[in-house]
């Protein structure tokens, strides 16, 4: 095998430096392009378009009025739920959207339920417990209206706000 002389080796060294630089630049540029192409998958935003972010939750005004059953179904389709009656965000939501909206509280045969999951709710922990406890109706659903929970007929149509946690 024939060995290369010093001049040939020197030429290879001179040519390999620009080639290496071009390869490095090409790798960096393609990496940036790949990142920009897959940006949504790599770094998802906290809330999707149309949802409003507040305190680790995303809120959506559906701009639809419907009954509680349909409201729960609509929020589930969006992988969300109706706002809970015990959340401190109710007043903030009212000030943002400025409308009455369903909350996930329902009274059925002296049982208080979260209509998102049909689990029992201890209403003694709610701020307007005395007002709620005085309800004598066999069935009642609730909306948040001007700073308080207000009883209404479950089949009536009210505004629907959906809520979900970040990255869900």
From Swiss-Prot:
Residue ranges occupied by any C-type lectin domain in the UniProt entry: 54-163
**Keyword Transferase (UniProt):** no
Q: Which residues are glycosylated?
A: 133
Span-the-membrane segments of this chain are: 15-37
Any ranges marked Intravirion in the topology annotation, and which?
Answer: 1-14
Q: Membrane topology for this entry?
A: Single-pass type II membrane protein
What Pfam families would the database entry show? Lectin_C
Q: Which InterPro entries match?
A: C-type_lectin-like, C-type_lectin-like/link_sf, CTDL_fold
Task: Write out the entry's keywords from A to Z.
Answer: Disulfide bond, Glycoprotein, Host Golgi apparatus, Membrane, Signal-anchor, Transmembrane, Transmembrane helix, Virion
Q: List the disulfide bonds.
A: 75-162, 141-154
**Into which family does the record put it?**
Belongs to the orthopoxvirus OPG162 protein family.
Assembly, in brief, is:
Interacts with protein OPG161. Interacts with protein OPG164. Interacts with protein OPG190.
- The molecule here is called Protein OPG162
- Lineage of the native species? Viruses, Varidnaviria, Bamfordvirae, Nucleocytoviricota, Pokkesviricetes
């Amino acid at each position: 095998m024939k060995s290369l002389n010093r001049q040939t080796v020197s030429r290879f060294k001179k040519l390999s430096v620009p080639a290496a630089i071009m390869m490095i630049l090409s790798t960096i540029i393609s990496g940036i392009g790949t990142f920009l192409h897959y940006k949504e998958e790599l770094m998802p935003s906290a809330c999707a378009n149309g949802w409003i972010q507040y305190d680790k939750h995303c809120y959506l005004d559906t701009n639809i009025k419907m009954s509680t059953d349909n409201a729960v179904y609509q929020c589930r389709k969006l992988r969300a739920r109706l706002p809970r009656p015990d959340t401190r965000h109710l007043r903030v939501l009212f000030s943002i959207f400025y409308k009455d909206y369903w909350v996930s509280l329902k009274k059925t045969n002296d049982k208080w339920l979260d209509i998102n999951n049909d689990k029992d709710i201890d209403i003694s922990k709610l701020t307007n417990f005395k007002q709620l406890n005085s309800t004598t109706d066999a069935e009642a659903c609730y909306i948040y209206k001007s700073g308080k929970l207000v009883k209404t007929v479950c089949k009536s149509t009210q505004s629907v706000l959906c809520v979900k946690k970040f990255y869900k």
